[in-house]
Amino acid sequence: NWRKQVKHGDIILVVDVGGGTTDLSLIAVLEREGNLELQRIAVGEHILLGGDNMDLALAYGVARKLAAEGKPLDAWQTRALAQACRAAKEQLLSDGAPESLPVVVPSRGSKLIGGSIRTEITRAEVLQTLVEGFFPPCAVSDAPQTRARSALTQLGLPYAQDAAITRHLAAFLTRQAGALAQAEGASFARPTALLFNGGVLKAPLIEQRIVQVLNGWLAQEGVPPARLLEGAELDLAVARGAAYLGYVNTLGRGVRIRGGTAQSYYVGVESNLPAIPGMEPPLCALCLAPFGMEEGTEVALDSQEFGLVVGEPVRLRFFGSSV
């Protein structure tokens, strides 16, 4: 029933907060031959920030409370506590939730039962840690906070430095201000509708905070608030969408969100200039696949000629941009 919820000209902001990542995108509702179509017009970075961060934040908060009571936890118990906090979080953020829930941290060794540590986590603690810590009110001009990094770091995934998802949302909409045909001088992309996805957003309080922050930004611009679209089961929507996409691709019919490549992709081309001491030749970026390039299409670069370096080690440089 999605056609009953949207209209031609709508810009839908999709906020997807899952277990380990946050993804943001903008989808335009278009009309073609009398039928409504969906086209993805902007995609944000794949932010490594999600429900796992929230579970760890709760676990470390409870661990500090236990340490103050003379009950320090080891690394194994902290991981077990994070799993217990995940279950408690989902219950305490739901409608009609109790004021607190018990949390049991198992011990290791022969005293598995008798040595277990019992505590509780309150609804107020969850609200303070998650809603205020990960979804704080902010201005649309705020950018994710960064800090000076240590010169040496362990190799691993590029986790987000700022845990505030609302600031990542503000940065995404600000970057995409020029991607939409909206009023000239708009400081950020202004969606007309909002769609949630991901198990984290099943919590009504988190959902309400995002709606409140986004519509606060829109009110400052003097535009109507974004309306919340009704979705299905938020933790199963991606799996169902993937299955439906396979169905559409196999049978060649059905509703498909047009969008193509999520980024523009470039290859580096070294400039042909005279040698200058201490200066490397400038690198130009040649676009190989523009944003939105559909699967199976080709782009001919007939007007370009390049020299290929052979017989020696070389380095191919590739770049991507979501702006």
Predicted features and spans:
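Oxyanion-binding/catalytic loops of NTP- or PPi-dependent enzymes
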Residues: 1-323
